[in-house]
Amino acid sequence: MAIERVREAVAVGGNRNLTHFRPSPAALVYHQPMDPKQPVLRRDILAAAGTVFTTSLFTGRVKGANDRIAIGFLGVGTMGTADLGYAMEVPELQPVAICDVYQPHRDRAAASAQKGGFQVKAVADFREILADRSVDAVCIATPDHWHAYMTVEACKAGKDVYVEKPASKGPDEGLKMVQAARKYNRVVQAGTMQRSGGNFRKAAELVASGALGEITFCHTFQSETTRRERYGNLPDAPVPDGLDWDMWLGPAPAVPFNPNRWGERIVFPTFRYFWDYAGGAMTDWGVHLIDPLHQCFGEVMPKSVTALGEKFYVQDNCDTPDTMHATFEYPKFLVTYESRTCNPMPLFGLNQGAGTSIHGTEGSLVVNRRGVWVIPNAGSRLSGATWENIPDMTPMNVPHWKNFVECIKTRQKPTSDIETCVRSSSVCQLANISMRAKTRVDWDEANWTSPQEAAKPYLKTVYRSPWKLEV
């Protein structure tokens, strides 16, 4: 399936107000903006049938400044309930409906909405909300294997969409999500909310300025501590009261209920550690780590991916590895990813076990949710390492939701337009494919596929009948 390449000139100059990066006067000479006339190559995923794409403006009804946007929430577990809370902080939004296949989730979310001053309709089948013409938009915070289907159907129903990351379970699904957004002229914001965080915007500005010099290597990492038994080897069990297990599975294979597959926990539900529903740490944290690099380097994708991973320590009934390492060959630099669930030591002395580092001929930069850290090379024109956490740069979620609302009104592309998240998610999915197929995966971006035969079975997401993903 062809992907049309679109050139989009991006002005990078101007006053950057890099308050997070304070170079010496000597460094200021080097800290010059890029040529504003220099174009950046963008690759927008378009429908094979010739879907029209405009670089910044969608067609469709534009809401007035005083209109409130009626929004429904599909999936109100841990993340969905959090999203409901963020949405209630945006005055232009009117939560009107919630959906979950588990009755206690519906009850909890309805109570949360009522506490915030909203009366919502609670349903068990998301199709009721999509069929309701009074609903303008939906938030999708289900397990990953539902993201693509619900997003496509919401676009077809004329709803704008906020969908959590990763965009999908497989790269093929992600492509159809972008096609649906373009075909039906919908605003689709992905939940990669770091793009609305000041730390990450400043990192992108610093990279664009050229202050780090020529960049050839980047590194991403995620570390934590877990018990050997982690989530345990729980046996299959009766379906809990109030849970529609068959609907929870949806397009995934029909299997008996298992507490770990469902993963009803306060934090990090365990469904994400089964291949039927998600992609483990690689597509959970990995998307948040790779996405800042795409934000810095113009959404470019790698030419190839090689990954290794195993369950060396953890002994539970989940599928995904406890230790993983991946190498991504981008056109002008290499990126590595490491995930250690058995060792919590953070890198670079950070007090958060996750981050992204960028290394150039003048210095290095580390960015995470706590700040931006610049480390000059010896003899560099940069002077003095800086590490700061500016409080007003930290908020991400509510500003991300406000951006979604603004774009619904103006029909502009949002900060995390679905295409950006599909790219970041697909890169992480390719790493999992490389690991599972035990092969290097070369990425043919123009045709959204890989020539490696061993990888091809993993590139196609199979849906259980009667579910079909059709744009």
Regions flagged by a language model, labelled:
Residues D35-V52:
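N-terminal secretory signal peptides and thylakoid transit peptides that target proteins
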Residues A48-G116, Q194-G197, L293:
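N-terminal Rossmann-like dinucleotide-binding module
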Residues V120-D125:
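Conserved SAM-binding strand-loop segment of SAM-dependent methyltransferases
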